[in-house]
Amino acid sequence: MKIEFVTTHAHQTVTFAGEELCSYLQRMLCREEGRFSVSLAVEPREGNDAFRVETGPSGGTITGSNPRSVLLGVYDYLHHLGCRFLTPMPQTEVVPEIPRDRLPARYEKQASFRHRGVCIEGANAAQNVLDFIRWLPKAGFNSFFLQFRLPYTFLARWYHHMENPLREPEAYTLADAEVHTALFERELQKRSLLLHKVGHGWTAEVLGSSAMGGWNAVEETVAAENLDMAALVDGKRGFFQGVPTNTSLCFSNPRTVDTFAERVVSYARRNPHVDCLHVWLADGFNNICECASCQKTTVSDQYVQLLNEIDRRLTAEGLGTKLVFLLYQELLWPPIRARLRSPDRFVLMFAPITRTFERSYDLSEVRSSIPEYVRNRITLPTSLGENLAFLRSWQARYDGDGFVFDYPLGRAHYGDFGYLHIARIIGQDIKKLRQMGLNGYLSCQELRACSPNMLPDYVMGALLFEENADVEERITEYLEAAYPGRTRLARDYLERLSELEVCDYLNGKGPRVDPDMARKLSAAAGLCEQMEQQLDSVPDTPHWKALRHHNRCIAHLARAMEALASGDREAALRLHRQLREYICRMEPEFQGWLDVYRLLDVTWNYTGFRAC
């Protein structure tokens, strides 16, 4: 069959959408005769991404509210015809052959939320990032966040092969990261995906340092001419615990505000293609300036005053850059007096990094008040109700656009060995966003959160586009496509693993010696060992091969964690070494499925093997 598209809208994303449609349909209709012609059109309108599909046996139209929506409509139509985009890895796509009579369709959709995206974390080869960007619109997402000025630290971790002594480190420089970042941004622009940038690093730059080392400590000290802009903590000014990214500033110093604001405005001036520019303060907590002038107010009041100054300067230059401000660590406490003067300039980002992932948000648990703020003596909230109380306190002072920046696939997911629990938590959370007064979700996560599969992200993308979608139907759809023929075997195994989830324990919450936890982990390891022989007889397809690898990985991890929870530190360390040896040895074969660096980093530093 001859497949073609026509359009009168000269936009690279619309043209790309047509090329994608033709490429996939050519494969799907390879045995059919005749012609199929689709017209791609843009009918601009305000609001969330929306598209309309109207096709018959010989062709039709796909219309979007913007160029990106045309592309989203194309991928949704392909999904309607039976395609399944299960992971960012092209070899995992399901592209069925279909008869011509399957082509007719008539429906329209509008995204439930404005903000639907992912933020880079973990360790990534450039190809991992490119594959992920190319997958985003196939899964219904519209945004991608490249942290820092350059995502150098997330790329260098891979090329330096951190945590894997079996691989020789490769050279990787800031210049390499610049080349790769330009490539990433071209791919995002090709798809009209919203680009989020920076976030971390501003405070380090104000002090004349670079944040390109991520969260690593440095030997350098703050230059004498900049020392007065560093926070005074415990009677000293300098890099907080040696880490520039974690160093707060003295915001009562006018030079600090001037320098910070000028850096943001200069960046916005030179990068007009950035859709959402994140303006964050230092990472870490209990690191706020204790000088007499700063103690007259709160850091959140100072933050809002800084944002207002940046807004004033952007407005003076005619720059319409959207600024994202952060509710995180000390900034969970709202300002007492200061208010944003131009709310439409800003987007609120709620980042409950210390929340539990054992259960979803319960809006009936929201507390009526928040704890008193005590400078550099805060304890971060862990309960969902307390986290939501902080959000409500901010929303009483700001009623503009906002989204949640959440972490289910940052650390806690490694404790859900079957990925069904965390997928359901994500789905339940998204269904509550509207009640929470939020217009979307950015997931701060490893891009290779794909062991045993990519089900959590698949559910995330689907629910963010259609909040009323049935989570269980999406789970079934995914598992049937990933494990055809013996879906029941895979599902039963993954369900049983998820019943034994230990998300909070793996993430460092609760006592490290816990007999009940040890019994649960013993059961998980035993289940993996029982299943090993059955999994050796399954088809040799990508998802089944990955599930076999995952089975062996979890058997090692669960046994190591069982020893840790039993208080046997010597055995825990020995078994963790066995886990390390196995996943490092297997990394070349399963690089796209498991972020070896991140799993080892999290279990060492958060689960507690470092202390053994």
Residue ranges and their predicted role:
Residues 1-113:
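Contiguous, structured surface segment used for ligand recognition
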Residues 4, 37, 52, 61, ...:
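Generic structural signal for residues positioned in beta-strands
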Residues 9-15, 29, 47, 112-398, ...:
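Aromatic-lined carbohydrate-binding surfaces of glycoside hydrolases
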Residues 19-24, 68-83, 138, 454-466, ...:
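Short, hydrophobic/amphipathic alpha-helical patches that form generic packing surfaces
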Residues 72, 258-259, 489:
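Short, solvent-exposed alpha-helical surface patches in well-structured domains
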Residues 437, 462-612:
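Catalytic domains of carbohydrate-active enzymes that cleave complex glycans
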